[in-house]
C-alpha cells in the first residue's frame, strides 16, 4: 500500500510540473508599425481589480517571454520591438518577462547592473506599445546544479550525491539532494533568501521611473522541498506558513527600494495538482499591492501530450480546471487580493478555452505560456491564436459585469455599470475574427469611436447599466449572461446581435 501511494505521488508530481515544457509560440519577425505610444500610465490596485490613473478597471491579456538560458535576456532575441508591435496589434497589453536570480547576481553579493539595464530597456520598449510588464523571477529545477535554472550555484550548498540518479526535468524534483537544496532556501540556511532579496531589491530600484513595470513576481513555481508530501491531499498548512514568511521577507526587501511596485505571489507548485493554497490564512496578508499569481494547467492533457497516455483523458480537464478555479475563488474570497493567471498553455485549443472562459467569467487577466524567441510568420494565425486573440474590454469606465466572447463566430457581449471617470470605456476588437468588418450596438451608451476602429470607445448616457454587442455582419450575436461576475459559464446565447439596430449607439465598419 505504501509503495502504491508513493508511485501515485511521483506521477502527480511529474504531471504537475510538466507544463513548463509546453511548446511555446515562436516570436515574429514582422516589421514594426507606427504603433508606439508616448507613455504608458502606471496601474494600481483598487480592491480586487487593476485600475488606471483615471479609475478605469483594466483587464490584462498577454503572453510570457522567458529565456531560461544564459544570458537570460538578449535584446535581439528574447523580445523585440517587432514582437511588441505584433502583440499590441493582436490586443495583448501585458508581457510576463523572465528574469533570473543567476543573471541578476552571478557573483555572490554583486548585482549585474548591465543585466538590469537590458531589462529596463525592454520594459520601456514594451511600454511604448501599450504593454505592461510583469517581471518574473523564473526558476525550473532550482539551479544548474541539477540541470535546471534559477538560483546561482554559489547560493545553494547542496550537491548531487555520488551515484545519485538524475532523471532530468521534471522528475529531478524528487531527487533527495535537490529537496535538500530547497530546504536550504526556505530555512535560509546559508542566506539564499537574503541574497535573493538583495537581487530583487536592486531590480525593483531599477524600475523606479519606469511606469511600464506593472509588478515583480517573486519566484516562479516554488517547490516545497522535503515538505512536498505534506501538501497532499488537502494542501500544506505548515509549509505555506513558512513560504508566506519568505514571500513577506522578499516583499519587504522590494518595497524598501520601490514602494509602488506591485508584488506577485505564486502558490506552491502543488497548486497545479488542485492542492489549495493556505496563503493568507494565518497570518492574513497585510502588505498592500499584492497580486496572487496562480497557474492553470490540465494534468490529464499534459500526461496525454508528454507521457503517451490516451488523449481521451483530456475529457477530464474541465473537472480539474474547475477545481483550480474554485481554489482561486476561495483565495479571492478569503483575502480580497486580485489575481492574474501568469501561466497557462496547452497544444489543445479546448483546454485553452477552459482557462479563457473561466477567466472571462471572473474578469481575471492572464498571460499565456509562451511566446518564444524564434522567428517566423505570425504565430497567432492558427487554432491557438484564434482562442487567445479576443475582443475584450481593456479599460472599463465603471464596474465590470458579465461578458462573453465566442472565438468561433466573433460574437461579443459585455455589460457594465458606468461611473464617471472622464475617460471612455475601451474595447479592443480582435483583428482576426471579423474579415468582413464588424457591427457594434450599445444599449445605455454611445459609441464615440470611428466606424471600424480597432478600439471601440463607449460613453455612458447615464447611470444605468451599459451593454455592448459586437459581431460580424449577419451574425445572430450573443447576449450577456445573467448574474454577477463569477457565477457561470461565459457562453452566452444568440440573441444580442448588433445588426439592424440603428440609433446613436450603433456603428459598423471594416476594421483596420
Residues covered by each model-derived region:
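Short linear motifs in intrinsically disordered
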Residues: 35-45, 425-432
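N-terminal-biased segments
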Residues: 37-44, 67-68, 73, 78-81, ...
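Active-site mouth of glycoside hydrolases
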Residues: 38-51, 57-60, 64-262, 267-279
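Substrate-binding clefts and catalytic carboxylate motifs of secreted carbohydrate-active enzymes
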Residues: 53-57, 197-199, 214, 223-469
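Secretory targeting and sorting signals
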Residues: 2-32
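Beta-strand-rich extracellular modules
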Residues: 471-473
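Short, basic/low-complexity N-terminal boundary segments at the transition from targeting/disordered tails
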Residues: 22-30, 35-40, 381-388
Amino acid at each position: 500500500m505504501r509503495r502504491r501511494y508513493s508511485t501515485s505521488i511521483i506521477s502527480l508530481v511529474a504531471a504537475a510540473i510538466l507544463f513548463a515544457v509546453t511548446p511555446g509560440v515562436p516570436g515574429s519577425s514582422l516589421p514594426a508599425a507606427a504603433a508606439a505610444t508616448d507613455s504608458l500610465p502606471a496601474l494600481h490596485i483598487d480592491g480586487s481589480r487593476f485600475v488606471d490613473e483615471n479609475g478605469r478597471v483594466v483587464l490584462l491579456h498577454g503572453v510570457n517571454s522567458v529565456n531560461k538560458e544564459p544570458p537570460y535576456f538578449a535584446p535581439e532575441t528574447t523580445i523585440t520591438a517587432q514582437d511588441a508591435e505584433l502583440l499590441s496589434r493582436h490586443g495583448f497589453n501585458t508581457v510576463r518577462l523572465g528574469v533570473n536570480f543567476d543573471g541578476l547576481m552571478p557573483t555572490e553579493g554583486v548585482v549585474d547592473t548591465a543585466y538590469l539595464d537590458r531589462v529596463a530597456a525592454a520594459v520601456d520598449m514594451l511600454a511604448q506599445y501599450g504593454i505592461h510588464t510583469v517581471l518574473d523571477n523564473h526558476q525550473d529545477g532550482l539551479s544548474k546544479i541539477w540541470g535546471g535554472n534559477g538560483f546561482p550555484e554559489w547560493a545553494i550548498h547542496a550537491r548531487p550525491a555520488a551515484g545519485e540518479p538524475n532523471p532530468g526535468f521534471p522528475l529531478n524534483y524528487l531527487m533527495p539532494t535537490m529537496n535538500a537544496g530547497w530546504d536550504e532556501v526556505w530555512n535560509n540556511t546559508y542566506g539564499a533568501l537574503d541574497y535573493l532579496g538583495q537581487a530583487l531589491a536592486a531590480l525593483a530600484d531599477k524600475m523606479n521611473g519606469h511606469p511600464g513595470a506593472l509588478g515583480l513576481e517573486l519566484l516562479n513555481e516554488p517547490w516545497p522541498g522535503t515538505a512536498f508530501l505534506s501538501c497532499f491531499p488537502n494542501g500544506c498548512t505548515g509549509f505555506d506558513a513558512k513560504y508566506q514568511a519568505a514571500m513577506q521577507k522578499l516583499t519587504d526587501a522590494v518595497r524598501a527600494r520601490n514602494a509602488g511596485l506591485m508584488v506577485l505571489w505564486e502558490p506552491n507548485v502543488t497548486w497545479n495538482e488542485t492542492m489549495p493554497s493556505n496563503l493568507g490564512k494565518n497570518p492574513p496578508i497585510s502588505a498592500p499591492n499584492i497580486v496572487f499569481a496562480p497557474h492553470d494547467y490540465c494534468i490529464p492533457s499534459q500526461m496525454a501530450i508528454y507521457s503517451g497516455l490516451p488523449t481521451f483523458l483530456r475529457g477530464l480537464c474541465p473537472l480539474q480546471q474547475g477545481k483550480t478555479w474554485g481554489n482561486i475563488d476561495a483565495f479571492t474570497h478569503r483575502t480580497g487580493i486580485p489575481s492574474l493567471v501568469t501561466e497557462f498553455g496547452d497544444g489543445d485549443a479546448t483546454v485553452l478555452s477552459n482557462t479563457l472562459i473561466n477567466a472571462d467569467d471572473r474578469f481575471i487577466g492572464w498571460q499565456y505560456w509562451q511566446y518564444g524567441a524564434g522567428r517566423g510568420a505570425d504565430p497567432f494565425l492558427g487554432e491557438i491564436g484564434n482562442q487567445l486573440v479576443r475582443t475584450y474590454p481593456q479599460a472599463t469606465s465603471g464596474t465590470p459585469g458579465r461578458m462573453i466572447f465566442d472565438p468561433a463566430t466573433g460574437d461579443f457581449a459585455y455589460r457594465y455599470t458606468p461611473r464617471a471617470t472622464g475617460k471612455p470605456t475601451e474595447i479592443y476588437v480582435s483583428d482576426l475574427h471579423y474579415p468582413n468588418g464588424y457591427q457594434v450596438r450599445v444599449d445605455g451608451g454611445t459609441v464615440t469611436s470611428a466606424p471600424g476602429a480597432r478600439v471601440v470607445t463607449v460613453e455612458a448616457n447615464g447611470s444605468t447599466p451599459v451593454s455592448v454587442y459586437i459581431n460580424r455582419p449577419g451574425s445572430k450575436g450573443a447576449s450577456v449572461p445573467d448574474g454577477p461576475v463569477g457565477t457561470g459559464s461565459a457562453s452566452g446565447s444568440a440573441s444580442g446581435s448588433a445588426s439592424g439596430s440603428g440609433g446613436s449607439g450603433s456603428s459598423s465598419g471594416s476594421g483596420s
